[in-house]
From Swiss-Prot:
Enzyme's top EC category: transferase
Residue stretches in coiled coil: none
Pfam family, one: UPRTase
Keywords from the named record: Allosteric enzyme, Glycosyltransferase, GTP-binding, Magnesium, Nucleotide-binding, Transferase
Gene this chain is encoded by: upp
Family: Belongs to the UPRTase family.
Protein name, UniProt field: Uracil phosphoribosyltransferase
Reaction(s) this enzyme catalyzes, per UniProt: UMP + diphosphate = 5-phospho-alpha-D-ribose 1-diphosphate + uracil
Amino acid sequence: MPIREIRHPLIRHKLGLMRRADISTKNFRELAQEVGALLTYEATADLTLESYDIQGWAGTVSVEKIAGKKITVVPILRAGIGMLDGVLSLIPGAKVSAVGVARNEETLQAHTYLEKLVPEIDERLAMIIDPMLATGSSMVATIDLLKKAGCKEIRAMVLVAAPEGIAAVERAHPDVMIYTASIDERLNEHGYIIPGLGDAGDKIFGTKQKDA
């Protein structure tokens, strides 16, 4: 299964705070960034390193740097923006590619309305960010788009994932690893994750919240 649930105590604690029904926009936004940063730490743990020499205070010293492919972070609009600053706090040199995906609330199917990909994205590691992996339709559509653009290495980071969304991504793209703070119970009849976080986009941007 292309999924890794990160059960670090800091992540569990912060995610618990995010589940509160009365959480403020400010606190939800800050926690989304913090958990996004912690997921980034785990999702980049296997990046290749190479050694090189520098002049230190006591002479020449061998140090390491990240080698291999450069990174592009791909927030799925709009909610993915809420994790972006946290991710970039750890990989500030990454380029940002934005993908806008909207979900039909009746059919629960996704359609892409915006794509702003960095040049030569086919030579980069693409790291998709989106707070919720619910039905999986938005994630699958984004991965489809990135692969069509030539991306060969793609990872995804989500705050909360539903089993239905995980299964959808696994069926369509079994080569894509998903990192999540929590695998939740299920989707409700409206396609929202239970227990979930509610509508993450609304909570990040302070717009109308839905009870889901």
